[in-house]
Every structure is written in structure tokens, then in C-alpha cells.
Regions:
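Basic helix-turn-helix/winged-helix DNA-binding cores
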Residues: 1-71
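C-terminal regulatory/oligomerization modules of transcriptional regulators
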Residues: 75-146
Length: 146
């Protein structure tokens, strides 16, 4: 058994992070010392590493908590329950990718319509016009029509 500072060091996180995980019921100390300090064990270390790996895959704290609960009572749950969590996350990621692709395409279109000249003022900038909802010059770059 070891104190919070040792667990933080072993996992490469701050003690504040561990307290946050504890507050959000992702981990619980294995016990307390006679003087009241939280004590942790190897199981806690594995839980923290599980949390960190899950976070690196984009899972939310709620999703991680649900997965940890399933892991702790694995014989009472199915792989299908676990897979439903990751499948839902994949669907959300795909939606975000689609939205970001749409945004990138629209931004690239207005960006390409601008000449980007340093010596020209922005009074006829096609990017500003497009963002203001104004008609952008008929395919010409913003500085070419002058």
C-alpha cells in the first residue's frame, strides 16, 4: 500500500488528478493509514492506467466510469454491453469527422477566394464579405477586381 503521491508518480499524473478521479467515483482508495492518509494498491494503479488509456481514446468520464463498473463485475456483463459503448463513441466520432470535413471545405472555399495581399486593405476582402453573408466576387480573388 502506498500514498497518493506514490500512485501519482507511478501513473504519471498529478495528485489533483487522482483526487478528481476519486471525487468522480472512478477510483476509491484501498484504505486509510492510521493518520488518515488515503492508501492505494496495485489494483488502483491498474484502474488509473485504464482511465488514462480510455481517455486517450476519447472516452468521456461517464463512459469510463461505466466501463470500470462493468470491468469490476465482468461476469455479470456481456461483451455486447462493452461494445455498445465503443460503437456509440465511434458513431459520434464519425459524425464529428463529417461535420469537420464540411467546415473545412467551406472555410477552404472562402480562404481560396481571397488574394491575401499584404499591401491591400481589407475593405474588399472576400473572406469578410462571405462571413457577412454578402455576394463574393464572381470567382475572382478579392483584390483582382480593382
Amino acid at each position: 500500500m502506498f500514498q497518493i503521491g506514490e500512485l501519482a508518480k507511478r501513473c504519471g499524473v498529478s495528485t489533483d488528478t487522482l483526487r478528481f478521479y476519486e471525487k468522480n467515483q472512478l477510483i476509491a482508495p484501498a484504505g486509510r493509514s492510521e493518520s488518515g492518509y488515503r492508501l492505494y494498491d496495485d489494483k488502483n494503479q491498474q484502474q488509473v492506467l485504464f482511465i488514462l488509456k480510455s481517455k486517450s481514446l476519447g472516452l468521456s468520464l461517464d463512459e469510463i466510469k461505466e466501463l470500470l463498473e462493468i470491468k469490476l463485475e465482468a461476469t455479470e456483463h456481456s461483451c455486447a454491453e462493452v461494445k455498445s459503448i465503443t460503437t456509440a463513441k465511434l458513431e459520434l466520432i464519425d459524425e464529428k469527422i463529417h461535420e469537420l470535413t464540411r467546415i473545412r471545405s467551406a472555410l477552404e472555399k472562402i480562404n481560396d477566394a481571397c488574394c491575401g495581399e499584404v499591401d491591400d486593405d481589407a475593405s474588399h476582402c472576400s473572406i469578410l464579405e462571405a462571413l457577412a453573408g454578402e455576394e463574393v466576387h464572381g470567382g475572382e480573388k478579392c483584390c483582382e477586381d480593382r
